[in-house]
UniProtKB/Swiss-Prot annotation:
This is ATP-dependent zinc metalloprotease FtsH 3. Acts as a processive, ATP-dependent zinc metallopeptidase for both cytoplasmic and membrane proteins. Plays a role in the quality control of integral membrane proteins. Keywords: ATP-binding, Cell membrane, Hydrolase, Membrane, Metal-binding, Metalloprotease, Nucleotide-binding, Protease, Transmembrane, Transmembrane helix, Zinc. HAMAP family: FtsH (MF_01458). NCBIfam families: FtsH_fam. It comes from the Bacteria. It is found in: Cell membrane. It comes from Symbiobacterium thermophilum (strain DSM 24528 / JCM 14929 / IAM 14863 / T). The active site is at E421. Residues 1-7, 125-626 are cytoplasmic. ATP binds at G197, P198, P199, G200, T201, G202, K203, T204. Pfam families: AAA, AAA_lid_3, FtsH_ext, Peptidase_M41. Binds 1 zinc ion per subunit.
């Protein structure tokens, strides 16, 4: 910092002095006229000279017009005629000065200052470009960051909820620690490991944990850091990355979002992207070029493995592909325990209950949830995080944004919202395959005027036809309540209708749940151009079948809507009572909500158990919903 300050001060001083000299010389040159000797003689004879000072080989003076002048005189031996001429004109003030070289210096400075300024400017520019030149030379270098700080080392203890994945990667760690054990047996450790799964499931954290457990250098780079607008830069960076890795082997090279550079070649508009494909080609060569005993392991992460080039996924490059999915109940509990460390919790905080309340949450979601709970507790001036803080944080994450209690809502809209949400609650309570009702509120949050929250009690990986129809019926319960109560419908059911239509179409075209169309898939999945797949594909069904698909979708939606109408018509009193209580309290949840529904409605019907039935003379276990 001091060196930079001294350099700036030096250049500023030079600049100020140069400007001052230039201004002075510029001012003098603007007021003084350079005359030749013959002009001076003529002006003297014409009486146009007011004063003159002789100083050796130079003379300076002033004309009658006020204009100042300088003139170079002949040698001293030839100046006698000039002196005699001046003495003959007594009106001219004559003066003599000792010979000095001020005129010479003035002319010299006037000539040299611009040159000096140009040289200084050139020197300054060269110094600046010297650093820039280094940056230019670094342009083709890898941007990988070497992580070696032991204080921030991540281990497998920091990763929870994905024990099976950690077991897969433990082999990589053991190889990095004891490579001879594998090499003596002729074993070849996987050169590359591809981690793929939904965002937030811990792919990057796992890669850091592998490096932390093995205690080796960890290079981290994003796939987008390779490709630039200049041709050849990406390939150069790939080469430099592997050169650095070889110097620090054994080590781990982690490429995050590898789909940015590893996308399938020759796809999209124009046949692909030349620079990206060159970079990918170089990456393929480097991954297949180094031998197993060099101790370099590539770990890559992506949430779009389907768009990667097949050559990148073949054995010898990414030998091992590991799916990292959303954690189950046991995994979520372990993740909650990790993120609860270091946070003061009230005794009422039950992590197991929270794990049950958050199905589908990833590790990143849970980390964000606990952070939101801590922020809410701090905002409420608490010393510890309570269960209510975490519950409010869950609602904030699920519903989007804080409660908007300050929003001014008319009584009419508030009443419509109350009946809409009560319709969801009553219909959902009377459906056998619906999840338990957890909360209902008419306080706006995010873009919603209110919401009804059903929470599953277990993780599900398949869903039956009966469950889908129950969800569709519950979703349309709000619209049905509006029509039954007010005889008028609103736009508040827009999201409900979109979800219901989407479910119905997938039942017909993807899941084969239509009796009329049978167990067939209709229509090819269309991938966008930027996903490096074909831009579009023709549908694989006729116009007649398209009409049948629309008819079946309409049938499923109308069936669900009529079912919701029937339930609310039968339990109209319960709809009215729940709406009144909701208008009074605005939010109902937990035991209070369950007690109210059990008081107003009969017990929820239990789903029919799956029973074997005879199919074609044999016995097979078939779900009635399918």
């Amino acid at each position: 910092m001091n060196k930079l300050f001294r350099s700036l001060a030096f250049y500023m001083l030079i600049l100020v002095i140069s400007v001052a000299i230039a201004v002075q010389l510029g001012g003098t040159s603007q007021q003084t006229t350079q005359l030749v000797y013959s002009d001076l003689v003529r002006y003297i004879q014409q009486g146009e000279v007011r004063s003159i000072t002789l100083s050796g080989a130079y003379a300076e003076g002033e004309l009658v017009s006020g204009e100042k002048f300088t003139v170079q005189l002949p040698p001293s031996s030839s100046q006698a005629p000039l002196v005699e001429m001046l003495q003959q004109h007594p009106n001219i003030k004559l003066d003599f000065r000792q010979d000095n070289t001020s005129g010479i210096w003035a002319m010299l400075l006037q000539t040299l200052v611009p040159v000096v300024l140009v040289l200084l400017a050139f020197f300054f520019i060269m110094q600046q470009t010297q650093g820039s030149g280094n940056r230019v030379m670094q342009f083709g270098k890898s941007r990988a960051r070497l992580v070696t700080d032991d204080r921030k080392r991540v281990t497998f203890d920091d990763v929870a909820g994905i024990d099976e994945v950690k077991e897969e990667l433990a082999e990589i760690v053991d190889f990095l620690k004891h490579p001879k054990r594998y090499l003596e047996l002729g074993a070849r450790i996987p050169k590359g490991v591809l981690l793929y799964g939904p965002p937030g499931t811990g792919k990057t954290l796992l890669a850091k944990a592998v490096a932390g457990e093995a205690g080796v250098p960890f290079f981290s780079i994003s796939g987008s850091d390779f490709v630039e607008m200049f041709v050849g830069v990406g390939a150069s960076r790939v080469r430099d990355l592997f050169e650095q890795a070889k110097k620090n082997s054994p080590c781990i090279v982690f490429i995050d979002e590898i789909d940015a550079v590893g996308r399938q070649r020759g796809a999209g508009y124009g046949g692909g992207h030349d620079e990206r494909e060159q970079t990918l080609n170089q990456l393929l060569v480097e991954m297949d070029g180094f031998s197993a005993n060099e101790g370099i392991i590539i770990i890559a992460a992506t949430n779009r493995p389907d768009v990667l080039d097949p050559a990148l996924l073949r054995p010898g490059r990414f030998d091992r592909q590991i799916v990292i999915d959303r954690p189950d109940l046991k995994g979520r509990l372990a993740i909650f325990q990790v993120h609860a460390k270091g946070k003061p919790l009230e005794p009422d905080v039950d992590l197991e209950v929270l794990a049950k309340r958050t199905p589908g949450f990833t590790g990143a979601d849970i980390a964000n949830l606990m952070n939101e709970a801590a922020l809410l507790a701090a905002r409420r001036r608490k010393k510890k995080i309570s269960m209510q803080d975490v519950e409010d944080a869950i609602d904030r994450v699920l519903a989007g944004g804080p409660e908007k209690k300050s929003r001014v809502i008319s009584e009419k809209e508030k009443r419509v919202t109350a009946y809409h949400e009560a319709g969801h609650a009553v219909v959902g309570h009377m459906l056998p395959h619906m999840d338990p009702l957890h909360k209902i509120t008419i306080i706006p949050r995010g873009r919603a005027m209110g919401y009804t929250l059903f929470l599953p009690v277990e993780d599900r990986y398949n869903i039956s036809k009966s469950e889908i129809l129950d969800r569709m019926t519950m979703a349309l319960g709000g619209r049905a309540a509006e029509e039954i109560t007010f005889g008028e419908i609103t736009s508040g059911a827009q999201d409900d209708i979109e979800r219901t239509t989407q479910w119905a179409r997938r039942m017909v075209t993807e899941w084969g749940m239509s009796e009329k169309l049978g167990p067939l898939t209709y229509g090819m999945k269309q991938d966008e151009v930027f996903l490096a797949r074909d831009m579009t594909r023709l549908r694989n069904y006729s116009e007649e079948v398209a009409g049948l698909i629309d008819e079946e979708v309409r049938k499923f939606v109308h069936m669900a809507y009529q079912r919701a109408i029937d339930i609310l018509t039968e339990h109209r009193d319960a709809l009215e009572k729940v709406s009144e209580v909701l208008l009074e309290k605005e939010t109902l949840e937990g035991k209070e909500l369950q007690d109210l529904l059990e008081q107003l409605l009969p017990p929820r019907p239990k789903p029919e158990p799956l029973k074997p039935r005879m199919v074609g003379g044999g016995t097979s276990q078939v779900a009635p919903a399918f």
